[in-house]
Amino acid sequence: MALAWCVVRRSASKFASVYGGRVRSISAVANRASLARNPSSIRPFVSRALNYSTAIDRISSEQTLIRVIDSEINSALQSDNIDSDEEMTPGSFPFRIEDKPGNQNVTLTRDYNGEHIKVVVSMPSLVSDENDDDDDDDEGPSNESSIPLVVTVTKKSGLTLEFSCMAFPDEIAIDALSVKHPGDSLEDQLANEGPDFEDLDENLKKTFYKFLEIRGVKASTTNFLHEYMTRKVNREYFLWLKNVKEFMEQ
């Protein structure tokens, strides 16, 4: 009788062990099937991991950008092209200089024999001579810097001569000349553009160049402006770098 009871207990124990293992296996399969049918139960964990990874990448990218900007700022500081231009302005320079940081133009003003003269100076650009392909004919650099100028000479009555010019090293080229009456509308100003300057008589053109030279718009002035505006380009770039860095650090 005892032997039979022992056999029964062993069989029951073995059955429970096997059955329990099958139950655990079935439960695991059921859980995986449940997750497959309802992935939202694991989505919060995946979402948090992705958000964390994205935040780390963003911070790393911004820190790298700030380091590169700092390097550019240090390079600019080591250059003498962002210093103040007050010391480099020649004593004989006849114009007052109005230069606001962040403004792409510089304004020169002076009064001469009852006339008010204003020169608006724009940023320099590089002019490339695309037609000069023969190296044997090169007598100098094929690229040169040019500065757009708008010169206005205004009488006390308000009547104005406006010159559109391009300043090259040691040379000024007048592109257009127009007369502006006080109170003229934009349509009137466009109507008073006048003839193409290149079509004028050579003596008349020379007279207008002399007219500007007497009022201080001459080669020595534009040579100074080339150096001044080159420094301004560097100063504006330095200011832009500082503003970008300030944004990235906030």
Curated annotation (Swiss-Prot):
It comes from the Eukaryota. Residues 124-147 are annotated as: Disordered. Keywords: Mitochondrion, Transit peptide. The keyword Repeat does not apply. Residues 129-141 have a biased composition (Acidic residues). GO terms for cellular component: Golgi apparatus; mitochondrial matrix; mitochondrion. InterPro entries: MAM33, MAM33_sf. It is found in: Mitochondrion matrix. Residues 1-52 form a transit peptide. Belongs to the MAM33 family. PANTHER family: COMPLEMENT COMPONENT 1, MITOCHONDRIAL GLYCOPROTEIN FAMILY PROTEIN. This is Uncharacterized protein At2g39795, mitochondrial. It comes from Arabidopsis thaliana.
